[in-house]
């Protein structure tokens, strides 16, 4: 008997599970994925690159094992101990072939641009894009909790620009500053638009033939996330 699975639905379900780790900050990974796609689109990327950025954004914190760790990641703009969960998340994904391509950028998604620039390729750019979108969301999430997102946009843009050429790739920051001039970039981060975005992406996702071994791998990923 042939087995089929919608891997888009698997990624989205994993993202929903990760939201439970955040408790007080749901949709963090979803917002990171949405922003990563918007920034990449500004750079003229193709649909395959955008799909990878979206999936990597959804799952970038798959290595976060507790609400306490999640809280530190979303409260501290830059934290020396952040690399551990990136390594663990990459290890988890590397062992699951359908999502193994996400492991390299996720491993590096808290690495500063200054540590990447001497060997900077597609993987490193994707990793720094995740880092950028992740840190934007840390700032935006606080503003949303205070119901002051649009009021705080200038300060968020200024803080991100202050780390250009240090934490973040200058080209990515330029793209962010360009696309984030529009209110629509920020309004898309609210809960309703985020869920609408997820629904649109899921609607036409194809079924893929798979094996029992792959389905067992899916179960293993879920067991790590919700343990």
Question: Where are these predicted regions, by residue range?
Answer:
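Intrinsically disordered, low-complexity terminal regulatory regions
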Residues: 3-45, 216-223
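Alpha-helical scaffolding flanking metal-ion-dependent phosphate/phosphodiester catalytic sites
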Residues: 7-14, 32, 52-72, 80-91, ...
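Short alpha-helix-to-loop micro-motif enriched in aromatics/charged/Gly
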Residues: 18-25, 41-49, 65-67, 117-123, ...
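Regulatory/sensor and coupling segments of signal-transduction and defense proteins
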Residues: 1, 15-16, 34, 137-140, ...
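Short, surface-exposed, polar/charged, turn-prone segments marking secondary-structure boundaries
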Residues: 42, 84-86, 159, 194, ...
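Surface-exposed, glycine/proline- and aromatic-rich loop segments on solvent-exposed faces
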Residues: 77
């Amino acid at each position: 008997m042939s087995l089929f699975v919608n891997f888009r639905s698997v990624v989205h379900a994993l993202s929903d599970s990760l939201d439970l780790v955040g408790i007080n900050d749901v949709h963090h990974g979803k917002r990171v994925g949405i922003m990563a796609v918007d920034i990449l689109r500004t750079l003229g990327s193709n649909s395959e690159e955008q799909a990878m950025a979206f999936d990597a954004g959804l799952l970038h914190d798959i290595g976060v094992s507790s609400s306490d760790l999640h809280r530190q990641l979303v409260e501290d703009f830059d934290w020396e101990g952040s690399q551990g969960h990136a390594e663990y998340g990459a290890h988890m994904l590397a062992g699951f072939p359908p999502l193994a391509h996400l492991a390299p950028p996720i491993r590096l998604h808290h690495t500063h641009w200054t540590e990447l620039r001497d060997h900077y390729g597609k993987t490193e750019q994707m990793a720094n894009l995740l880092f950028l979108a992740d840190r934007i969301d840390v700032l935006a999430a606080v503003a949303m909790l205070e119901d002051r997102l649009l009021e705080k946009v200038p300060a968020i843009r200024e803080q991100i620009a202050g780390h250009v050429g240090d934490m973040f790739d200058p080209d990515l920051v330029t793209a962010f500053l360009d696309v984030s001039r529009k209110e629509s970039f920020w309004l898309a981060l609210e809960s309703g638009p985020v869920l609408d975005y997820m629904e649109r992406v899921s609607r036409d996702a194809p079924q893929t033939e798979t094996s029992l071994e792959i389905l067992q791998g899916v179960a293993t990923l879920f067991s790590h996330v919700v343990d």
